[in-house]
Amino acid sequence: MEEHERIRISGVINDVTFANPENGFTVLELESGDELITAVGVMPELKAGELLELSGYWDFHASFGRQFRVELCEHKMPASAGDILRYLAAGGVKGIGSKLAVKIVDKFGENTLDIIENDPERLAQIRGISPEKAKQISADFKRQFAVREIMISLEKYGMTTAECVKAFNAFGVRAADIIKRNPYALCGEGVGFSFERAEFIADQLPDPPDNGYRLQAGVLHVMSHNLSNGHTCIPREKMFAPCAELLSTNEETVDITIDELIGSGRLVSEFIDNREFLFLPHIYKAEKSSAERMKQILRFPPAGRKAADREIDRIEKKNGIKYGDLQRKAIVTAIERGLLILTGGPGTGKTTTLNGILQLFEDDGLKVALAAPTGRAAKRMSEVTGRPAKTIHRLLEVEWDKHDRPQFSRNARNPLDAQAVILDELSMVDITLFSSFLEALPIGCRLIMVGDSDQLPPVGAGNVLHDMIASGVIPVVELTEVFRQAMESLIVENAHRIVKGEPPKLGVRDKDFFFMRTDSPFIAAKTVSDLCAARLPRAYGYSPLDDIQVICPSRMGECGTNNINRVMQASLNPPDASKPETTVGATVFRTGDKVMQTRNNYDIEWTGPDGDGTGIFNGDIGILRKVDLRSRMAEIMFDERKAVIPFEALQELELAYAVTVHKSQGNEFPAVIMPIIGVPPRLAYRNLLYTGVTRAKKILVLVGSQSQIYSMAANDKKARRYSALKHFLLVNE
């Protein structure tokens, strides 16, 4: 039979060896006649013992041999008593095991499935099945086939198995009817389809949906797009042109649609300085509640006390240090007011000041919790304070709801067990996480927030640190004095020069800041790879994987992360028969690769020296230790945490020999290599350069164009972010 000739086969499932519930990818063994066939493809939820009719073609896999690639899967219910027994005994219906299956089929024979579906009370006649269990068995059976019926109804409109499951979870048994009437309901909360995807499905329907659904979904899509760009709100007039273009309509229609959305509560309107701004409701709530909680802390401050000079003198003597005036001011403010934003650049003594505050809190017998946005930032916080620190998510005891959204066990009803909380890397915290964090603070809890306002704003929406400082209502101490020991570092000196808009000193020998000039992006990429693979390890003994990090302004271009990751993978971890690999999209993942998690996944289980846990988060970097082609599982070490994930979860990873500046936030590395050449204009600004430079602890090498480095240092333009936290902090209700 010719390869890729489309055929149909039928048989009984012997075993489902792998199934990904998110995207429906399934590997199963099918008994077809006397042959045991491996079938792979996107299929609905299936159980051993079920009868299938499959359409597809034969293919050959390099590792697993001959396979049947499934393009269409049709389910056939078992009809004979023998087939029904086999189906139930294999776990085809939740709650029925092999022994119970024999009892049920012995009693009801070929009518078994009809009774489970339509007359479940009769199941309670069998010993071991209570009336409650009979109802649950029937409900699970109906749900299983409801999903399949929805798939049959909706797949002809281009919806995938995973999309059908999402629709069922959101809308239940009415999913098909709802989608046929209004496919744009798929864009709503809890489903999460893109507007473009809903448009495609709408185009496949025999009867076009009401245009009002489309208009409202389009406006909300533009709002969500602005949210993904960091804006918590947007001026109303700025919505007209992009919405009109997207929807091929006029601005008056957009204006009317916005009013309808405000009237139905799907948008919120707020006037700020006599200008109307629009919010998505959950972001409006997050920003407003954050401001209200901060104002509550200001109105009813924690019980402070006078900080005696002799106490600070004692800490100085104990630690062999001498605080500057601003450091003393920060310590006094923290002790006396219990609320502080501590900010400052590298070398200004934030860590030393923080440790002084910690010591006085502990001397007062306070229970102190330390937190940071990312795992690496929390680990670094632990290292510099000598005390345990957690990610914000772990501190708040995150859980995962049925729509894959984080829910926190710690909240206003179940606040944190702490009398003081210190939050580091505040510049990285977006407004939704900050709102959840503030909600979990107990009444009277002291709050110390630390961050560098010159760094990039968070990847998520909002500009929390900047807005709180700009409001002027929260106590802020900015450390500006760079201590003599820190000024011996050219990294520190140049970081402060960049912040001031001055060109960094390049070409200074025998320091920790190096520059390698080239005007060729191709040569720059090769130089970066050579520095990481050979020159820095040879000169300083650094590990290319553990100690050196390449940080790029952009993903695209010769010196973007996409290309440099390919170049460095070929150099540091080339193909080898002893290193199994698998391909996901355009990326080859090979045993030994350096990888990064690109989204929060709260379900991944891991084991570590201090116990087990769940959750790997956006920005976590690890090493791919094992790629098991037979089980289709991968083992990754994230620092000291070992996680084993299915191949399908690899789509949440990317190679991390090189990462973007945005992804590097909150991390520090012994050595950083940063190519600066051909940087896109939208990224060629000062705080991006500054953020990249300050990721290096011991060695920094810039590779590329001197003129571009100088122009980035001079460019104080920042991407405009619309946010309202400052407004809500200042407004009097």
Where are these regions (language model features)?
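Conserved pre-motif I regulatory segment
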Residues: 311-338
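Conserved helicase motor core of P-loop NTPases
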Residues: 453-614
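Loop/turn positions that initiate beta-strands
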Residues: 49-51, 592, 619
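C-terminal accessory regions
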Residues: 500, 609, 618-733
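ASCE P-loop NTPase helicase motor core
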Residues: 233, 328-331, 336-509
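Accessory, non-ATPase domains that flank or precede helicase/AAA+ motor cores in DNA-metabolism machines
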Residues: 1-310, 733
